[in-house]
């Protein structure tokens, strides 16, 4: 899926090093994520193995937004197990310099297309209650707030509330 400035592609094992580096960058840009500038603490081989499995999966997917081969954003769906297998967790991130360019919408549309093709019934996500830009994006695609989870994060001694949101694909 190509756009004027960026393309949306499914993550592959060869994206692992660039993806780990990307996660360090975005972790240092905001406090909206579950990690900081340390990124996710995975070895390169573990990330490659994870992406290799995910690239063939119909239960999980990770898309990348790229500009000239550089990762500027990512979005993923991860299916729950057993009694919750009709539900998937949705996550999305974008380098701050690319906020507002349409990449988050393009990633979300790719995710929704994958979800519908694979008969997922519910998408769930967690978002900082004060991240109005992200909340607006989710609401644009039909996500609804279920509740607020007080003190979901604790950063530098400050409690951060999160909203739990859901999109039903059955309606």
Write out the residue ranges for each language-model feature.
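Short glycine/proline-centered loop/turn elements that form peptide/ligand docking sites
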Residues: 108, 131-134, 151-156
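Conserved acetyl-CoA-binding loop-helix of GNAT-fold acetyltransferases
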Residues: 100-113, 117, 136-140
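Conserved GNAT acetyl-CoA-binding A-motif
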Residues: 115-126
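Conserved catalytic-core motifs of GNAT/GCN5-like acyltransferases
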Residues: 124-127, 139, 144-160
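Acetyl-CoA-dependent GNAT
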Residues: 10-13, 24-27, 37-97, 108-109, ...
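Conserved G/P- and acidic residue-centered "switch" motifs that form tight phosphate/ATP-binding loops
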Residues: 69, 102, 131
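Hydrophobic pocket/interface hotspot
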Residues: 19
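Terminal substrate-recognition subdomain of acyl/acetyltransferases
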Residues: 2, 159-171
């Amino acid at each position: 899926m190509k756009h004027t400035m960026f393309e949306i592609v499914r993550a592959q094992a060869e994206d692992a090093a660039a993806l780990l580096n990307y996660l360090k960058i975005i972790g240092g840009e905001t406090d909206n994520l579950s990690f900081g500038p340390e990124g996710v603490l995975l070895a390169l081989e573990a990330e490659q193995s994870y992406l290799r499995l995910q690239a063939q999966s119909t239960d999980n997917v990770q898309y990348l937004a790229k500009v000239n081969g550089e990762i500027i954003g990512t979005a993923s769906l991860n299916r729950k197990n057993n009694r919750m297998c009709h539900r998937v967790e949705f996550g999305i991130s974008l380098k701050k310099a690319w906020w507002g360019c349409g990449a988050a919408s393009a990633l979300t549309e790719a995710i929704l297309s994958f979800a519908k093709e694979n008969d997922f019934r519910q998408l769930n996500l967690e978002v900082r209650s004060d991240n109005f830009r992200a909340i607006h994006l989710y609401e644009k695609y039909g996500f609804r707030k279920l509740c607020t989870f007080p003190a979901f994060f604790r950063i530098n001694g400050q409690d951060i509330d999160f909203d739990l949101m859901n999109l039903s694909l059955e309606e």
